[in-house]
């Protein structure tokens, strides 16, 4: 907890 939400990780090619 206490962490900002991270952006979605795109799938690797």
Swiss-Prot record:
GO terms for molecular function: peptidase inhibitor activity; toxin activity. One of its GO terms (biological process) is regulation of blood pressure. Keywords: Hypotensive agent, Metalloenzyme inhibitor, Metalloprotease inhibitor, Protease inhibitor, Pyrrolidone carboxylic acid, Secreted, Toxin. It comes from the Eukaryota. The modification Pyrrolidone carboxylic acid is found at residue 1. One of its GO terms (cellular component) is extracellular region. Expressed by the venom gland. The keyword Secreted applies. It is found in: Secreted. The keyword Lipid metabolism does not apply. This peptide both inhibits the activity of the angiotensin-converting enzyme (ACE) and enhances the action of bradykinin by inhibiting the peptidases that inactivate it. It acts as an indirect hypotensive agent. Belongs to the bradykinin-potentiating peptide family. This is Bradykinin-potentiating peptide 13c.
């Amino acid at each position: 907890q206490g962490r900002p939400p991270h952006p979605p990780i795109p799938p690797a090619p």
